[in-house]
C-alpha cells in the first residue's frame, strides 16, 4: 500500500483536460502530494466526483461569491471548502478561468507518509485514513490555507503521475453521494476493487467498470 520510494512527475496545466467530467476521469490513478518540512505525504486518487457547469449542486451555480471565488480560477487550482461545518475537502478547478466548476477528490490510496497521516488521525485503521474527502484532507494536512493553491507547480500541494503515465486505469461510474439534488446523475468515478473507495462497500464488486 505505502511506497515512499515512488517516483512521481508533476502534472502541468496543459496535461489536464479542460472539462469537468473528463478531468474527473483523468484524475483516477494520478497522485495528490503534499510536501511537508518533515517529508512527503501522498495518495493515489481512486475516487472523484464531477460538479460541472449548470449542475445545481455545483457551489458556483449561484454565481461568484466570497466563499467560492477560487472555483473561478484557471483549471488546475485547488478549491478547498468546509463541509458540515467540520471537515475541509479538496476540489480541483476544472474549467477555464471565470467559469466556475470543479472535481471533488473523494478518496485516495496512501502511498507515502503513512506515519504522518496516522499522527493526524490517531486510532484510525490504515484502510480508513483517506477513504472519504474529509478524511483525506485531514490526513494530508490540507486546510483552508490551500484554497486557491496552484496544483500544477510540483511544490507544496500538487498533482502528479507515476512516470509519464497519463491514461487513467479502468474505472466504474455511479451516482454521487451526500447531495440532495441531481442525485440521478452518473458523475462519480472510481477504481473498481479499491478498498479505499468511500461510501457503501458494495462498490467494490457491485458495478461493472466502464473503460477509461
From Swiss-Prot:
It is an enzyme of class 3 (hydrolase). HAMAP family: 3MGH. SUPFAM superfamilies: FMT C-terminal domain-like. This is Putative 3-methyladenine DNA glycosylase. Gene3D superfamilies: Methylpurine-DNA glycosylase (MPG). It comes from the Bacteria. Pfam families: Pur_DNA_glyco.
Amino acid at each position: 500500500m505505502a511506497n515512499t520510494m515512488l517516483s512521481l512527475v508533476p502534472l502541468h496545466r496543459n496535461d489536464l483536460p479542460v472539462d469537468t467530467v473528463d478531468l474527473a476521469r483523468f484524475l483516477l490513478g494520478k497522485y495528490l502530494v503534499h510536501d511537508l518540512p518533515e517529508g512527503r505525504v501522498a495518495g493515489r486518487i481512486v475516487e472523484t466526483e464531477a460538479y460541472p457547469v449548470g449542475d445545481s449542486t455545483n457551489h458556483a451555480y449561484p454565481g461568484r461569491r466570497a466563499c467560492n471565488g477560487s472555483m473561478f480560477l484557471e483549471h488546475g487550482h485547488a478549491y478547498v471548502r468546509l463541509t458540515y461545518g467540520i471537515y475541509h475537502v479538496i476540489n480541483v478547478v476544472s474549467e477555464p478561468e471565470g467559469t466556475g466548476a470543479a472535481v471533488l477528490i473523494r478518496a485516495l490510496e496512501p502511498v507515502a507518509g503513512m506515519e504522518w497521516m496516522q499522527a493526524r488521525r490517531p486510532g484510525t485503521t490504515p484502510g480508513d485514513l483517506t477513504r472519504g474527502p474529509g478524511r483525506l484532507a485531514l490526513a494530508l494536512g490540507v486546510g483552508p490555507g490551500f484554497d486557491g493553491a496552484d496544483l500544477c507547480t510540483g511544490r507544496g500541494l500538487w498533482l502528479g503521475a507515476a512516470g509519464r503515465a497519463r491514461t487513467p486505469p479502468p474505472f466504474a461510474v455511479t451516482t454521487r453521494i451526500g447531495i440532495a439534488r441531481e442525485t440521478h446523475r452518473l458523475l462519480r468515478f472510481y477504481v473498481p476493487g479499491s478498498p479505499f473507495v468511500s461510501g457503501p462497500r458494495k462498490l467494490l464488486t457491485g458495478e461493472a467498470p466502464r473503460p477509461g
